[in-house]
Amino acid sequence: MSDFWDKNKGSIASGFKSAGKYTYQGAKYVGKSGYNASKNHYNKSKEQRDKRDKKKGKKKNGDDEYSGDDSYSDDDSSYSTASIPVSSMKDPNSFPPPPLKPQQVQATSSSHSVEQYPASAGVPQQQLRQLPPQPISATQQPAWPQQPAANQYDGQVSAPDQSQMQYGGQTQYQQPPAMQQPPAMQQHPAMQQPPDMQQPPDMQQPPAMQQPPAMQQPPAMQQPPAMQQPPAMQQPPAMQQPPAMQQPPNMVGQPSNQFQLPEPQQRQTPPLPPVTSQPYGEAQNQAQNQGQFQATPLSQLQNMQQEETTRSVPNAYDPQQTYSQPPSIPQRHTPQPVVNQVQYQESQSSIPQVNQDYYGQQPEVNQQNNLMNRSIPPPMQQQPPMQQQPPMQQQPPMQQQPPMQQQPPMPPRGPSLAAPAYGGTPNINANAQLPASSGITVKPYNPDEVQTREPLALKVDIGNLPPPPTHRDRGTETRPPSEPKPSPAIRNPISAVPAVSRASTLDSSSVPVNSIPAHQNQPIYMQDNSSSVESFPDEETSDFNNLPPPPPPNRRVTEQNLEKSAKSSTIGQEQRNDSKTEPPRAAIVGSFNSNPTINFEPPPKPFRPVVNSDRKSESPVQPQPLARSANGPPALPSRRGTQTSFESHPTPPSMESSTPSLPNRLNRNEPPIAEKPVSSFPPPPKPFRRVEAESPSHSQVNDSNKESSAPRTHNFGNDEDEDISAPVKWNPPAELLERKSEIDVKKGKKAPPPVVKPKPKNLSSVNKVNPEYEGHKPVGSMNQNQNQNQNQNSLNSITDELTHVHLRKTGISLEDEGKKFGGNDTSIDDIPPKFEKIETSRKPKAPPAVPKKKDSIRGAPPPVPAKKKNLNATPQPPPSRRNNNVNNDNDDDDSNPFEKYMRDAVPAEENRLRK
């Protein structure tokens, strides 16, 4: 081992060098790679942030800035975590809804859904999808004169136009039941315009009114000359349908197209309020009332357009905008009556005039772009409308304008109907009337604007209202002394009784009027607010306030006591009014005042039933109040919360005592027994016990009691002659003692035990047994000092000791043993133990002694732990449970833990395997 380092230190050093070299190179490579990667990532993300900042700088207008997150992505075009401002987003109303499968229901947020019907066979579902229209700026305007080339694309008719003639928020072209086309004639979803430019059901135009005369309608379906459009509204020759696109002769009376269109439910839009889902009758009635509205002036529409284009934040969703078609109605081949055609043509002819003047012209390129984006299938051709109107989807700012609110009414047969504001036309009821003024502008709702609320002025003077009603037991009413109380005549039920009967009622029931609460169910009498509470006369109020308080509850009341209590209560009331320490308060019936003012003597004690009430009522002298004893019980609580004096209580009649040993009970100047404190009474007699020292003869007891045989009289009324607080000693008379002794003899009570002879001095040592005898310690053993003290005790203590010691009779008397060994001079050791304890004889013998282990085998005993405090209170087992034969050296040690347990249960060593 000593040569290991000398032999291998070169290889060990080279290994350390190579390991350190490659470790350094690897760490350097990893560090450089990470640094370059992070640097490249930072540069790329910085370029992306710069590009975004440039784009946002171009898009920002005025205050439309947003504080986006500058976090960057890992690559160039994977994703961007920065949020896009809402102002730069496209209007969601311009997007078409996603296509739905047949029998699929579109989930709506307006608590109703539109059921979808299967599409017509022959048109694939993929061909029904439509791209969203290309948004253009607000400065671009649709072109009214449109070339035929704009209506055709690859030999097929474009979709101008029947749907674009409609305005408002209606997405689907839903025909009324009587005017709907069969599935072969229905409009393709690609020809439908976005939801912000279509017409609600009440403004829809049936296809029968949109067909030119070249479509071979019957004469009844043709438009009469009086209902045709004005020259400015009619379609130019270039907009007419070519002959090849007209309806074949076999379709006379039922206009149709050369292709089959799916049902309008194939293209579902956002929800529409239920009010727009109207049957055909309502739509027809609304169409008849369309003539009541006239067109808005051109200058006003231009001003509204400028206001709407300057607004950067779009309005919130208008629930009145019709974004979806009404619930679909089964398509029927039903010809249209002539009356309906005339009515719809009348409402139709007034629409395009404002649109032409307001929107101006639009280049043909925009129309072609829209037609190309709609992706109409090649075999499809469109039903040409009779009138072509400009597409209204190119004006998104007009969507914010409140619809149908700027058109004043006009005569029913007016030539033009007002074109409502672009986007979100509400459903017009048949009886709807628009405001007459045409200069109304709607201010958009700004949630951040601070709204000032007008203060509401109370029309009722609160100061003149009476106080509200309160519960009668809620509390006492406190009023200043100067303010008069309201008369109880309007508050108390007693007020309905006349004054004479009311006074008699008070005397009989002893219930004062002022004890009834001041506020008691005020809504019953609160009828006139003009009359105040203070307008009642003061004479009646003073009469009620001067009534005496109620007396204490007496179960047996006489008329004399009532008169006396009323007189004394009136005196106490006058004394309280003179003091004026606090304002008077009305008492509450059935309540107890927890904080009374205690400035009067305690009430009298309860009394027994009246035996002779006339004798005490004639006493002219009032008894003096007794001084309360320190040992007596506390006074009873007051039964009333009002202030009373001791004189206000009537003196209860006393019961004449039938005891002949108390002659002073007949004295009328002395208060009755019920009014005296309990502590003044003598204690009850103690149970009789004979004195054992005087038990041989009762003559001494009888002689000593002759002097006290005379009855003792007590003057309870005189406080100077007797100390009431001192306990009164009472000795029973001799007759009572003799009578009780005779009763005890008759009952068979044992005679007293005979006089016990004096105990010998060494009697207690007889029971002392040698500790080695029977292998146990006697319980009654005592030391020598205890024996000496025991000899000095009295005879009673010796008797008590003998009663607790159970001795077994051995046939040897104690006197014989004393005479045998010479009386009291016998020593303790000379007397053999003739007596043993009974309990000892019944116990089994102790187990044999275990031999002591050798010190060499026996290990050192473990250290004895300190004695715990909680073990001191543990009672020790009886001496018989201890094993005293094994090593009794440590028995007297207080800290020895084996005193509390059996030594056999505790091993003496930790390891038992060494035995």
UniProtKB/Swiss-Prot annotation:
GO cellular component: actin cortical patch; membrane raft
Main location: membrane
Record's compositionally biased regions (Acidic residues): 64-77
One Gene Ontology term from the biological process aspect of the record: barbed-end actin filament capping
Keywords: Membrane
Amino acid composition bias (Low complexity), ranges on this chain: 140-152, 162-249, 283-295, 383-404, 654-663, 783-793
Subcellular location: Membrane raft
Biased composition annotated in UniProt, kind: Pro residues: 405-414
Membrane-topology descriptor: Peripheral membrane protein
Biased composition (Basic and acidic residues): 470-482, 556-566, 736-746, 831-842
Compositionally biased tracts (Polar residues): 103-114, 253-269, 296-373, 426-440, 502-534, 696-716
A Pfam cross-reference name: AIM3
Region (Disordered): 30-915
Family: Belongs to the AIM3 family.
Protein name (database record): Altered inheritance of mitochondria protein 3
Gene: AIM3
